[in-house]
Amino acid sequence: MFKLSVLKTSCPSCLRGEFFAFILKRILSQSPERGNDKQLFFLALSFYTRLPHPQSLDYKQLPQAAVYLPLIGWLTGGICALVFYLADLLWPQATAAILALIAGILLTGGLHEDGFADVCDGFGGGMNKQRILEIMKDSHIGVYGLLGLLLLLLLKISVLAAMPTSSVPLVLVAGHSISRLPPLLLMQRYDYARGNDSKSSGAVYKPNFRELIFATVIALLPLALLPALSAPAIIPVLLATVFLGHYFYRRIGGYTGDCLGASQQVAETVFYLSVSALWIFI
């Protein structure tokens, strides 16, 4: 049994922050893998970013490290936010937004953007499952991928450039964190589309309920820093995830790593668009 101490503040953002922190503490304290958390986090850091990490890691546990994707989003989003803040002191907001996006791509090695481009190529040019998977496996980018990636980046830049300047850093942190939850939801709901025909199938992992709750809390925590009206922005993100999951399942019977990367990019962009639209009413 436990009880929640009385919150002695009238600030809505503070209340939300303390509530999420309390829930996170409870989840962490009950995690059966508690002693392994540091190892999994550094595995996630090594795979999903280009940031320095310990060299002595057990990569057999790499699939389970996906649970820490939202926490990686805190890190990449925080660095992008810092880049935006510093760049905005010297240049126009649109330039600062571009530099923040460049920072994000450099931090992750363009991992998710590459997945999005491959999905555009595969689903744009493939007429059946086999052909779609073949195209996505090709390392070369095609017309669909190039156009899709270009339009996606332009959309992000235009939305971030139109937001209130002081709010963009927090939106970047929230966007990077929340957008890394959809890949986990797809992994839990659907099967790996390549089956046993790919060496990558050994990296397939289905998060359990507790891991999903943990990842969800981590992903949503940054929302506590934004105005209360921003909370509904998570709904379009979830709807987009449901749509993508159904679309992937209908076309190829599940997901691939590229599909997961694409879901992150779509979710991030949808979140920015949703927050921007909601703030019209503030």
Report each predicted region and the residues it spans.
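Glycine/small-residue-rich loop that forms an oxyanion/phosphate-binding "nest" at active or ligand-binding sites
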Residues: 114, 124-125
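Juxtamembrane helix-boundary/capping and inter-helix hinge elements in multi-pass membrane proteins
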Residues: 125-131
